[in-house]
Amino acid sequence: MNTTVISILTTISISFFALNASGQTYPGKALQLQMQKEETAFLANMKPGLQHTQMLAVRDAMKGDYSALDQIRQSRNQAPVLPETVETKYITPDICLFSPVNATERKRPLLLYLHGGGWCFGSINSCARFCAALAEAGDCCVAALNYRLAPKYTFPMPLNDCIEAFEYLKQHAEEWGCDSSRISIGGDSAGGNLALAASMSLTGVHKVIPIYPVIKLFTEVTSSWKEYAQGYGDDAELLAAFNEAYSSGDSHNPLVSVGLASDETLTELPPVLIISAGHDILFDQTAEFARRLQRLGHPLSYHVFPTATHLFITVPGQPAAFQESVRIVSRFLNE
């Protein structure tokens, strides 16, 4: 029996029908329209030239000048207000545990979460809203990691940090009331890439949850690459700078460009949940990756928000996509 479950908010292209081997679900039109309304407002409020400025900062840092990149990192590292129903605790200097305050006798699932930011910026604070929302909605624990950032720390150093964090969580999960046999890895954008690469490198990962992940760190001019190359949350020139800063000339390594992993490697992954934004430069490469998992008969749940754009996990402004992601991921972690 094919274990692939595809959830698509609307039919975006004929290519997706090939994925629908075991059925589709369609949320109501109201949610689709709400996501579209929020995306329009989000993009209208985006500061003109922001991503070009970020690209220049990354390029300068690659040449040794970190002044502009450090300013961007500081501006994106503001601690958000979190619900009182969730406790936060640093269990190491670089890992913050988000857990529900209410007591429970059951062992909770645990998610290692890896923030986005093109491997060059981002932090625990970037993803804290999402981690706290997951902990509350899913009655689970979420451990967010500050992995080392490019371009100072290139592949494989950030990936090694993620692998070591998982091993640490595995050793200590029971101390926090978590189930050491149900530790999953997730992340958004660059963090989704790291989640997949770490899951390919480890044994014992329960599930893997990449959200609008970077699948290939080299340019392939697809329809989404052309249509959403500018003005949609992750411009092509910025993505190219991110890719070069992290890969450091090793972009075709399958632990860097996870879409190049062998069939054997992919079939050894744990069950996969992918969430994609339809208006995203990364959309086509993620869809191709999902189709490949489907052809291999791999356990896959693939959700597309066709009227959302990149960044809805870490940057406020697309609450419907954010909340729907919380609902989907929470359910997946507890299945």
Stretch-by-stretch model annotation:
Residues M1-T25:
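Bacterial Sec-dependent N-terminal signal peptides
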Residues Y26-Y66, Q71-Q74, Q78-E335:
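Alpha/beta-hydrolase superfamily serine-hydrolase fold, recognizing
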